[in-house]
Structure formats: structure tokens, C-alpha cells
Amino acid sequence: MDEFTSDSLTTSRLLRQISHSDSLSSVGSSSNRSNSNYENKINNGIINDFDSTNANDGISNNSNNSNNNNNSSSILKIHQSPQSILSTEQQHQIQQYQQYHQQQIYESGYVPPHVYIFDPDYKSNNDEEDKEKRSLIELNKSTDLSNIKTTTTTTTTTTPPPLMIPENEEENKQLRQEILNELSKSESFTKIKEPGEIYGFCECSLLYNHLTCANLVITSNYLIFLPQQQVDSDYVLENYLYKKGDFFWKKYWFVLTPDSISWYKSSILKETHYPNGTILLSKIVTVDKLDPEETGKPFCLQIMTNTSIHLIQLDTEPQLEHWYHEINRMQKNLNVTIPIGDIVSITMESNAALFFDSLCLTLKKGENCLVTPSSSSNEVYSLLIKLWNRNRGVTVVEPEKQQRLLEFQKTFKLSQGVNLLIETPCVFYQDEEFSYEGVLYATTEGTLYFSSLDSVLIIPESDIYAITIDRKSDNRDALKVYTTDYDVLFFDSIDDIETFFNVISTSLARSNPKIFFSTVGQIPPIDEPKHDEKEHKSTYQTISSGIRSWKIPIPSLPNFSIPIPKSIPIPLFRSKSSSHLDPQNSQQQQQQQQQSSSLQLDDNNNNIVIPHTSNPTTIIPSTSSSSAIPPPPSSTSSTSSTTHEKTIIIQKNSSINSTFHDIFPLLPLDETVIMFQNCSLYYYSYDSNVEGIVYITKSYIAFNPSPLDKQQQQQQQQQQQQPNSSSITSTTYDRDLDTDSDTDSESDFDYPKQSQHDNSVVMVNNNQYKVKEVLMKKALIPIEDIVSVTKERFLLFFNQCVKIITLDHKWIFGSLNNINSFYNLILETWKQIPKTLLDSSSSSSSSSSSSLLSSSPNNNNSDLNINGNSEGSIFTPLESIKIKNKLGLPADEVLITWFNCTNFKGAQLKYGFLYISNNNICFRSKFGFQKRTIVIPLSQVIEIKKYSAFIPNGIKITTASHHEFQFASFIHRNRVYQILYETWLKANNKKSNSSNSLSSSPTITSPLAISPSIASPSITPPSSTPPSSTTPSSTTPTITSPTIHSTLPSTVVYNDIQEIIDGENNSNNNNNNNNTNNTNKSNSFIGNVEEDVDKIKRSIKSLPILKIHSAQQQQQQQPKTTTTTTSTTTTNLISPRLLTPLTITQSPGFSSLVNSPILPVKPLRITILTIGSRGDIQPFIALSLGLKEYGHNVTLATHELYRDLISKEFGLNYQPLGGDPRELMDLCVRNGIFTPKFIKEALSRFRSFIDDLLLTCWKAVQNSNTQVLIATPGCFAGPHIGEVLQIPFFNAFTMPFTRTRTYPNPFAPFASHQMGGVFNLATHVMMEKVLWQPISGQINQWRTETLKIPPWNSSVSINETYRMPYLYCFSKYLVPKPPDWSGEIAITGYWTLKNQANSDSPPDDLIQFLNEESSTENDDIPIYIGFGSIVIDNPTALSLLLIEAIKLSGKRAIISQGWGGLSIDEHNNNNNNNNNNNNGENSDSNKSSLQSNRIYLLKKPVDHSWLFEKVSLVISHGGAGTVAASLLAAKPTIVVPFFGDQFFWGERIKQTGIGTSIPFDILTAKSLSSHIISILNEPSVRAKVNKMSHLLKREDGVKTAIDFIHRYLPFSFIPPREIPFSSAPNSCMGCKQPFTLLHVMKARVHCHCCGKIFCESCTSHKCPIKKYRINTPVRVCDKCFNDLQSNPSSNSFILND
């Protein structure tokens, strides 16, 4: 008996704890334990002593069993002790007992989760097993332990059984309905089409590519794995990162979603909706952080998938850690669906070291996954076997019979099970030269199978001509089987030949009455063959006669207990489009055959071409049962896919075919080798070539790499012959000649191969060998997947090579001895593919994603093609793939047609092609350096109409977000219009039908496969109709909710929107208002735009986005949401934690901060320095409150004007700063910021202000005993204080203030003008000098006298020099992140207050004014006009202008008095005020504002978030806070900028199409009134501002900022300024050795950590300094080196440090 050691127990227990780390709330709950009616009485002596034996392993005992620990004796000890002897039978029974209770003895206090089984026949099937368990328990009780000195005290405990089986049918229905109700609230489950009836539910761990914990839902059609560890489905991590391409690194905008990693060219998605590339998280095998020495670059992530390797470089170490952990975290939230029909085998893996009691599932694609149930593995295994057999149409009751059938299936390599009719031992022979003893089987399908130790014989029913009993045999009667080609097979030594003959004759007579039967040995009648058959027979008569000449070997079969074939341990690399071995594809292939055979081969020949001939009497046709070509849509036959057409005899362990099938055990037996050669295969995906042998069969091209040591020897010999070329390895790629100049290289990561030093060459070569050892895979290329075959020269091989392009990969075979034969054979085999199969495969590619995942491959959506032609007849397969890759379309998209046209955007015309597919309208420009790519989902289109403007024959397409796309110059505009219109209607009808049927028959979505770029020209296909894209009918495993393009924009407001598309038609919004309104009424398909949006809302089904929330989040949101309906069943079943009900209605606002969260860092003393107006201060109040809620001690230092607001109203610590914001505001408004007049007056008036500000900042930080400092650039003192105190420092600002080419500096005089990247960058450099030069003397004097540090003499700021972390409190949707901003810069979103102060409650007369309605209009919502803290030079003139504009617009208005002192002229409003004076509602003494029917003057500050919700339009000065409040309230904005950043915000409002900007210098009443009317009457503006508001409310800027601060705390220190040599002492500051004339040769060296000067001996150490973001080793002094080694992370405030 195998002993269960403590090591294996520890490993198993750890795996179980991993699997149960996130268990369901219903599992092991108190209600289930209290209501359990089951009792499991066991002998606790075994368990307790076993626990005490492994006490060192951390296994705790239950309190109920604590009294038995000292007195009990373990049976395991008895067995292991040499003095204790048990009988063999007792040892075997105890071993069975231990295996059965393995799940319950890890921890005595552990209760396994329940496994729900709803099979009504399950209990009866397990009665015998229950009896066996009870007998084992009784055996344990009666075991004689007299040899043990200590007595055993046996106690019983009552534990809830892990298996939950309903008592009756009613309870069965109730439990099933309860779980179904929970599952129906999960989008991952509802998207599955026809999931079937639920039979089981349990927790498990799934090992597929990576290990995850999941909940397994077992239905009659699927195995559905839902995640246990939930993450926020709306959470998106995005930033600019570098990705390794073919040769260079390129920066992309990376977006991490809950199911994929996608990258785009830029963060502004106004050119395309689809990414440049995508990595499915489900396909990721490993994510590793690479050492800089391996890649030559720091902060690199290596992401390895099934087929490729991607290398990504990040900017900082915190960013690297953040992405690394987020990718691993989101992998735990994936959903995997496995159709039961795709399972090839299910076995129980009980001997594995880590995964005992696991279920090994082998899938059709050759993939394997391990499922480890939390408990009751045997019961789950039995249930899966039953459902699997039922799905295959096989009825198996006895386990022995089931195992025998599985062994039979594996023996004959059948992909589907069969029903055995009878079997008998016999001797098979055809002549005296060979005979085999074995077993003859007959199945209900009529096929005869014979198996022996040396051979396998398969005689299909279609090849049987006659069966007789030979009475003339010498020994006993023999059974003679005649084939249709008149070969005779003898089966002798059958025990009861009469019975066997009667059974098979009865069965065959029913299926094929033409078969001749005789019991007396009568010779069957022979029909004269037809003329063509005679010629065919005579052609091969000299080659083969009889079965002897076509003996085909098969490999030795693996043991039954291990389902994975034991072949050479090299992974298999398949073409992902149709590399699976689909058994349901033989019907169509049997129509047209490729006849092939193989003669006896010489294993020693390196270049063997087997004649492409066959004997039709003996060779199975080319259309094997395992071929991957799908049947045509009309094929509905349910015949077993494992049937053969001709008789096959296969000898084991002989010739090359035996070796071939040993290497590729999953291939069917009839795949014989036609040719094999030694060659080199260049793996294009990995940029590596591998030596090996290529095999060609009738259906596949297979490659097996040679061992790595042989390749190394060959390469070393080549390097010795060519010593000069050893240092440089060729990295030449075969580029696509048709590739555009802007086409990004999507090739996967290749390690660096060039070096200048010999040592680095050795390291690089070693890395290459290591990579090849990891990536060396067998290749299996289905011939039907081939798109093109070319013979050309490739620089890597120097000679000619054969390039094969499939649907998803590129294969290059070189170093071929007989390249012409290899090329011709592949070309000839490719030509033999039946044309009907190609047509069916091309038509099947047009099927929808839901049909791809259905079990039936017969669905076809060819009606999507308007022209009635399939995609293959318009576009060749290679053209189709190239077009989809350039447009970023998914692989299953069906291209319908294309047209030449021009696209009009702004003032630019682009000529190109308009592509129409079944789901999108696409445009791709042809000329120009920068290509224009536009992808418009048909689901977003609300209007298609003809128009003629600047360019003739135009068509305008309008989306739901009111973006207009104009295409013109169509030669046949009517035809284009008709196709677009019909395709649009069909797409919307399909979406509507699928949406309406979602509740009854939910659909499943397939993963969106983004094929890699195929960069190679192809030759003309060899046949008239080339092979087109084949759609795999197998879909295992499938991610049920892959949102690869989760950033795809959908209908405004109604769906989740990830990005806003700006810049499409913003310049023409105002010019085309009247034209748009008129055409909407006359020429549009749907008259009213609002009705269009409503209809699209009802009909559109957007891309699926996961929305499963955690239980904690649901509990927090529950008071704000509608109550979910509870089940009416009486069963006390608690909902599983991960299947929590989804909220139907949620608050549109952002989620609030978590109360009392677990602090990631220690509580810190944080000081925030800021100055400015109320709008500048308020965001930092929100940040301070958030930090305080996290447990930090926050001090906010600002002007004395805001003391009461900060300390009294919000309860924050306050420190005063110098200066009056009113004086600064008045100076800026009167003179303009940073003008010569402004600088002249500022130097005279504000020199004392700067000195006072610097001193008060220093005092505020000292008084607060600051540990972390956050400051705005306007305080000037922030980075200098952070440098002297050596504390973490963060910049924070409300506008972009970092150098970039995307935006100009907001304070620049021309900030509102976009003049290119060089100009924008120059404005930042100019403003840095303008800000620094006037005050540099004061700051340096303050540094030297007060801070005691050297002066800062550089004109480049400290922030730019050291790349300090920067927090920007605005939205990425309004100001997208520029590509040249690194990871230290975070755009967090707006910092808004959760609750405003009570003192800002609105006055009663304002509420009354808002509630009044105009007598002329029913909906006369007022507009808001206010300029906040702007000090206006002439407030009376501005007030009159505003009143006049309000009168012209005919709107009601609220005017805020603000700091500018706006007022209303009483004379202009006498008529409107008479009614109010007569009513006497307001007295003259207490009147705080003037109220009229049209205008209200607001004198008291009111909360903008409350007020803006009540108005229709906001007119403001463009301050950052006011703009944020208006956007959050979803109100259009008119910005009247006065100075500074207000011009920048006005320009951003105008560019995004949510308002406009009118500079104050050119403001007139007429222009203002016209803009008010146009904006309020423009539907597109309302739609865009609603979208923007929805996006902003989803952001949580405060939480994002706090997370960023915590993440960058260890890396936000400012290095101390190096002491100048001129002012340094004349001696080393370490050893004190003088630098005098006697030591003039002694070098002086700066320490990069402390900045002091030392000699070389005192700075001999080098190391990176992470807290200063210095990642390369630099010189440091001995003291600093010791400090860095003792605390390498410099993160003393981290809790877990």
C-alpha cells in the first residue's frame, strides 16, 4: 500500500486551501449545517491521530476532538510501525477509507463546500457505493488494536455531508429553480445559447493555461466555469506603454479590461473603434517580470500565450507592479464554457502529486484541462460520465463496461463511442505468412474490429460484401469476410461461431440487405466491375495485391488511467483556426476522395517521397473521420463520425508510420506518411528557426523538432565554419509588399540578438537556446487551412524555401533536400480539396458568433450578403484577412463588398475604399503618409441619407452620438445606398431579434480572435476557387463574455461607454444646424432624432460587458437600488456569493469611498499646499477628506480667506499661507497673465508676496511635522521643501502643466490655438522660463539661507529634471493623456465633494424662481451665467451686455454676482418687477437678490452641483471647477475666458462638441444670444454632453489619486542637489583625506544619494537608487550604500515592509 506522507499531505492541503479561498456564501453556511438531515459517523481516532502526526504542518484539530488527541492511536502509525501488522485486506480497506475521506481530514474544523446534484437517478445508482462506505466504517470500528498499549477512544461527530441530493422530485425542482434564478442574473450564464437542464453545481479549481478557482455549473450541454474571485467589471487600467515589434519598440495606448489586453495607436479613439492588437487573458500562460539584463531595458513584462510571446515595457517600477498584479487578478475573473460534445475523454486522475481526485478532460483541439472539485470528486465524475455518454448517444450503466468501451475507443483511435454487440477471441489471417491472435468485436453500427498485440483491423459495414462460414477448415470452422474489392479475411478458432454468425448477420442484414450470408461456405456471386473500375484496378495491380502490402503501423497506446497520450514531451503547435480534430466532418469528405497509400518505407532515408498511389480495395480515403473540414450546411446526418469507408489493417511498431503516430498520437490511423524530409522550420511568431523533420499526409503537414542538443551542436559547427558571423544573428523578416507605411508591426517579441562585446554574445546565444527550449513545439498544419503556398528565397536560409500561409500563421520551411518535390506535393494535395467543401467553408464563415458556438455546424447566415455571393467569391481569403487586419475587424466578420470613394472630414479629403461588412461600415484611405481608418458599427447608425454639398454623389451616415461621416464621389451612388440601407436594416433586425429572445434562449458570444498580421504576398491559388476561411465547429473552451473591444462606444447614455470620440464633425456643428434640422424632416429614414435614439435603444444589443459585482459592493449599493425578487420556494438555499443578483437600477454617480478600509500604508501626516480661488481650493478639500477617510492626518495650507471653510465646515487641519487671491485675480484680469505689463506690475507689487509665500509654506510643513507633501506649482516652494526634508513629494494641479506636444501650456498667450507639436512644446519651455526667471533669485536665496541647500541654477524645473509624480485632477475623457507623458503622470478624474457644506443651502426665492414656468412656453428652464472669482473692471457694462443677450435669446436666466460685482439695471426691468412689488413677497430691507420673471440675481454662493442640475445651459469663465460641475450635471457650456487656463478649457469644450467658447474681448450680446439658441436647439450637443457626463460620473478621481499616492510613495523622493566643487571643502567628506596639491591626482566623486563629495575609495560601491527613480547602478558613498542595502525599498511607511 502506498503511504500517504506528510509532504504530499502538505501539498494537497495547500492546493485545497487555494481552491477554497473564495468559497460560496451558501457553502458551509450555518443554515445548511443546522438544517442538515445527514449524519456521517466515522472513527475520529484515525483522523485525530493523523492530525497530531502532522501537527508541524499546521493542521489544527477541531475543538470537539481535542480530548481525543492524547488517548487515540492512529491506524496509520500502526501500519507504518514495524511492530504493527495488519492483514492485506485490512490495509486495502483502510487505504480506500483514507482516499474516500481525503477531502475531510485536512483540517478537522474544515467543512467542505456542498456539491449540488439534481440527477433523480443518482441516489439509486450509488446504493452499492453507500453500502461499501458503511462497511468500511464498520471495519474501522472492529479493527483489532490490541497490540497497542494505549487504548483508543472512539467518538462520533455529526458533520454536514458535502453532497447535497434532493430527497424528492419536488425538492429537486425547488433547488434547481433556485440556482437557475441566481444564474439567470449573471450575464456570463445568460449569454449561453441553449445551456440545457442543470444537473449539478459545485466549487472547483480549473487548470487551463493557468490555475483559477471557479464555480462549476453542470448542464446537459455545457460545463460552465464561473469565477469565484470577483473584480469590478467596469474597472479599466490604461496607459501608454512600449511594445516590442519586429525591430523597434513602439508606444501604444494599452487598455486592460476584465478579459483582454488591447493596444491602440493613441488614447483618442476618433479614427477607429478597434484595437491594433489584443491578448485574451484566457490564453495567457504566464506573466513574468524580466530582468533588465535579459532585455536591455528596465521594467519589462513578458506575456506568454498559447501561440506567442509579447514583451511590454512600462515606465516605472510602481507601474510595472500595478499592471502585473492587475493582470493576474483579472485572470481570476474569467468565464470558461466547455461544450460536453467537445470532450474526447474524461478520466479520474488520482495518482498525481498535486491534483489528486482531479478530472482530466481531453478536448477535441487536443487541449487538456484539470478540474478539481472541492469535494465529492467521485460523484461529480460519475455525473459527468453519465452526461457525456448521453450526449454521445451511448448508454452505459456498468462502470466496468464503461471502462471497457473507453479502452476500446482508445485502442482503435475512435473520437466517438460505439456500442459493442458481441466479442470473441479468434485468430486472424489472410495467408500462411502472417496470423494474429486477438479479439474480434462487432458493433451495432455493423463495423467489425479486430485487435491483437501486433495489429489492428477495422472492417466497416460499407466495405463488407459477404460473410460466410468456411466448413472446409482443417481445424475448426472459420469465418470468412469478403470485402467489396473481393479480398478475403479469415477469422479462425472462434468458440461459438454459430452464435457469433447469427448475431452479426442479423444486425448487418437490417443495415445493409445487400450483404451475402452463408453458413455452408457458399462462395458469394461476383459482379462484373465497371469499365472505369477495371482501369483503376489494373493501374495499381503491379503495386499492391491484397492486404499484406499496406500494413500501416500505429503507436503503442497509453495506459487507460492517464488520458493524455504519452508521446515525446514536446508541446503541439496548431493552426488555431481549425487545428482541432473534429470527428463530425466525414460526411462531406466522403463525397470526393483523395486516394493515397504508402509503400514500405526505409527509416534510414532522410528524403523519402512515398508514391501518391493507392489500392482502392484497401486504403481508407483521404476524407478521414478526423479531418477538420466542416460538413456543408445541408448535411444533417447523425451517422457516427468514426466510421470508415474501406477496410484498414494496421501493424503496430513498424516502419516510419509507427514513429509518426508516436509523435502525433491524436491523429487518426488513416493519416499515413506520404513524404518526410529533414528541414528547418522558421517560427514566424517567435522569430526562431528549429531543426526537425516534416511529414506530409493527405490532410496535414506535421513538423517534429529534433532534440535541442543536436541543434546546438549543428549551430556550433556552423559558427566554427563562419567565425565572423557569430556575433550577429540575422533578424530579417519577410515583409509584406502590400503593407502600408503606417501599418504597425504586430510580430511578437524576439530577444535581442546583436551585441558589441563577446561576453554579451555568449549571453545572447544562451538566451536564444533557452527560448528555443521553451518554445520548441511540434507543428500541425491542416491543409484545408492553407491560404497560399509560395516558393521563394529567405535570407535566414540563404536558399529557396517554401512559405505556407494559413488563416492565422505563417510557416517557412527551409534547408530542404528535395524542395521541388515537397512544394509540388503540397500544391497537388491542396488542389485535391473538393470545391464543394471550400464553398461550404466560405459560407460557414459568414455565420454569426452565436452559431459558431452552437453544437450544430449547420447554421448559415449567407443572407447577410447583399449580392448573394459568399465572401470568397468577392475577396480571396488572403485579401480578406489583410483587409480585416488593416481595419482591425474580428476574424469572423464577413466582408460583403467594397467601393471607391472619398471621405470628407473637416477641410481634408481622403481618397480610399469603403468596405461594407455584415456588422460595420469601414473606410480606409489609400494615399498619404498617415492613413485614415474609420470603422462605424451598424448598431450605432441611426440615419443614412443622400446629400450633395462640396463634393458630388455623397452619402452621409449619422451615428447615435450624432457624429456625421460623409462619403462621396460614388460612381453608382444608388447601388451603394441600397446596399448600405439593406445591410443596416438586417443588422438592426438581427440585433433586435437576439435582444428580444434573450430571456428565453440566451445567446453565447465567441471570443474575438484578432489574427496576427500576415505579411507576405501570395501566389495565385492553385484552384479556381481557393480555400477560404474555415470556421471551427468546435468551440472548446469558450470565454462566454469576451469584451475584447469593451471600449467600443455604444448608444449614448443607455449603455456603458468607455471612450468618447471627438473631433469628427465638431467644426461644422454650428454651420449645419439648419441643414440638419431640415434634412431630418425630409430625407431621413426616421423623422425625429429623439425617436431614432429610442428605437436604437430598444433594438441595439451592444457588445457584452461583464457586470458581476462583489458581494461587498452589492451590500453597499443595495439601499440605493430596487429590491430584487426573492424566490417563492421554501428551500433554505442561500445564494452563492459570486452569483449575487445584479442591480437593475444604480445611481449614476461614482461609487463612494469604502468606509474604514484596510490601509495599504501606515497612517501618515500629509500636508497639502495650494493657493487660488474657491474653485482652485475645493478639489484639494475633496482630496484631503479622502485621505482623512483612509486614516491619514491631513493638513491643508492655503489663504487665510478659507480658514473657516476648511477647519469649521469640513473639519480639516489648517495652516495659513500668505497672499490675497483677490489682488492676484485683479492683476491677471486687468493686465492679462504673463504679459509684459503684468510682469512689470507683478515684480513691483508681489515681490513681498513671494517671500511671504515661501516662508509660510516652510512654516506650514514644519508645524505639521509632515511626512508626505503635496503641492501645486503656484506655491513654488513644494519641490524645494521635499528635497531638503527628503520626504515623498507629489505635484498636483487642475490643468495640464507638464511638457507635451499634444497641448500648449494653459498660461501661454496662444493657448487656444493648436499650431502643432513643436509649438505646443515650445509654449511649455517658454512658460517655465517666464515663471522661473523673475523669482529665481528670491527662491535661491531662500534655499541657501533658510533651507541650507545649494541653489537651483537650471532653467529646467525640478519636476521636469527628475520626472516627479504628478496628479492632474481632471478627466481623461475631456483631456486625453498625451503619448509623451510617462507613467509618473496620472490623470485621475475630477476631485469632487461627496457632501457640500450646509451653509451653501439655496435661498427660498431662488427655489421659487426655478419652479416658475413661463407663460409662453411650457418648458422654459433658465440658464446660468456666472464668472466666479473673476474681478471685472467694468461690471456695469458687462451686466448690460448679459441682460441684452438674455432678452434676444428669449430665455430665463440666473446671473451670479460673484467677485466681479454683476448687477441688474432696475430701469430695464420695471415692467417685469411690478407684479413682484404688488405681491409684497420680499421686503426692501431683507431683499438679498432681485427677482423677476426673466432674470434672477444670485448674490449668495450656492452649490454648483445642485444648481446646475436645475438649469439648461451654463455660461462661465471657464474655471476648472465650474467646467467640471457643468459637465457632471450634463449641461452644455459656453466659456467666456478672461485669462490663463480659461482659454485652454474653452478650447477643449469646443473641440469635444459639448459647448463653445467666446473670448471676453470679442463678446457681444448678439453673438452670445445666437450661441445660446444654437446650442440649446442642437440635439448632437445634448447627446455628447450626456455621454460626457455619464463617463465622468463613472470616474472616482479621489480614490484613483489616493491609490496613485500610495503606489508611488517609495519612489517620489527628490535627490539632493550635488554640492558644487567650487564651494566644497578641500577634503573627502568621508575619510577626510585632503584634496591638496600633494593629492592633485586624486579624483573627486559625487555621491548620487546624498550629493556630497568623496574620494574614489569612499565611493567604490555602485547600486540603483529606487527612491530617486535611478534604476541603473551609480556611485554611492559607503554610508549611503549601507543604508540602501539595509532598506532597499526605502519604504518605511509600508505596513508589510
UniProtKB/Swiss-Prot annotation:
SMART domains: FYVE, GRAM, PH. Residues 234-332 form the PH domain. A zinc finger (FYVE-type) spans 1622-1685. GO terms for biological process: carbohydrate metabolic process; lipid glycosylation; sterol biosynthetic process; sterol metabolic process. Keywords: Glycosyltransferase, Lipid biosynthesis, Lipid metabolism, Metal-binding, Repeat, Steroid biosynthesis, Steroid metabolism, Sterol biosynthesis, Sterol metabolism, Transferase, Zinc, Zinc-finger. Pfam families: EryCIII-like_C, FYVE, Glyco_transf_28, GRAM, PH. PROSITE patterns: PH_DOMAIN, ZF_FYVE. Residues 739-749 have a biased composition (Acidic residues). Residues 658-793, 881-948 form the GRAM domain. Its EC number is 2.4.1.173. InterPro entries: EryCIII-like_C, Glycosyltransferase_28, GlycoTrans_28_N, GRAM, PH-like_dom_sf, PH_domain, UDP_glucos_trans, Znf_FYVE. Residues 20-40, 142-166, 573-645, 707-756, 1011-1047, 1062-1085, 1110-1130, 1466-1488 are annotated as: Disordered. Residues 584-628, 711-722, 1026-1047, 1065-1084, 1112-1130, 1469-1479 have a biased composition (Low complexity). Coiled coil: none annotated. GO terms for molecular function: sterol 3-beta-glucosyltransferase activity; zinc ion binding. It is an enzyme of class 2 (transferase). It comes from the Eukaryota. Zn(2+) 2 binds at residues 1647, 1650, 1677, 1680. The keyword Repeat applies. It catalyses: a sterol + UDP-alpha-D-glucose = a sterol 3-beta-D-glucoside + UDP + H(+). Zn(2+) 1 binds at residues 1628, 1631, 1655, 1658. Belongs to the glycosyltransferase 28 family. Involved in the biosynthesis of sterol glucoside. Can use different sterols such as cholesterol, sitosterol, and ergosterol as sugar acceptors. This is UDP-sugar-dependent glycosyltransferase 52.
